[in-house]
UniProtKB/Swiss-Prot annotation:
Coiled coil: none annotated. GO terms for cellular component: cytoplasm; nucleus; ribonucleoprotein complex; ribosome. Ubiquitin is synthesized as a polyubiquitin precursor with exact head to tail repeats, the number of repeats differs between species. In some species there is a final amino-acid after the last repeat. Some ubiquitin genes contain a single copy of ubiquitin fused to a ribosomal protein (either eL40 or eS31). This is Ubiquitin-ribosomal protein eS31 fusion protein. GO terms for biological process: translation. The record marks R54, R72 as: Interacts with activating enzyme. GO terms for molecular function: structural constituent of ribosome; zinc ion binding. There is a cross-link at G76 (Glycyl lysine isopeptide (Gly-Lys) (interchain with K-? in acceptor proteins)). Keywords: Cytoplasm, Isopeptide bond, Metal-binding, Nucleus, Ribonucleoprotein, Ribosomal protein, Ubl conjugation, Zinc, Zinc-finger. There is a cross-link at K48 (Glycyl lysine isopeptide (Lys-Gly) (interchain with G-Cter in ubiquitin)). It comes from Plutella xylostella.
Amino acid sequence: MQIFVKTLTGKTITLEVEPSDTIENVKAKIQDKEGIPPDQQRLIFAGKQLEDGRTLSDYNIQKESTLHLVLRLRGGAKKRKKKNYSTPKKIKHKKKKVKLAVLRFYKVDENGKIHRLRRECTSEQCGAGVFMAVMEDRHYCGKCHRTMVFKDDDK
């Protein structure tokens, strides 16, 4: 049977084939006529690209059908180089989990009474849960910078 192959230039070539011929055979015949290597050829019929291992009858290609020949495009996006960093990556700080850490803030005396070792900041800006640092003669809040000086009887 006779089929037509339309190239990109608009030129139509005729090929004598059998329905049992594979797509590879058709590409070889196109190479004989046009000189285009089979690995660069893409044949399209009814909007589908024809795969090499299949036959013409698999795609229901009948006599006087027209195949479209396009050239294969190689490659894709440009390959990017791997970046070389001059300084090593900074290691993220991992918070250490200490069991019963809350016990550092309280002291239990021999009578069983609980005393707070640190003082909470009284500022409205800080709120509850912000403890003040204990200095030699004062308490200091690192968040709002409030300082409370000890009296002799406070210690």
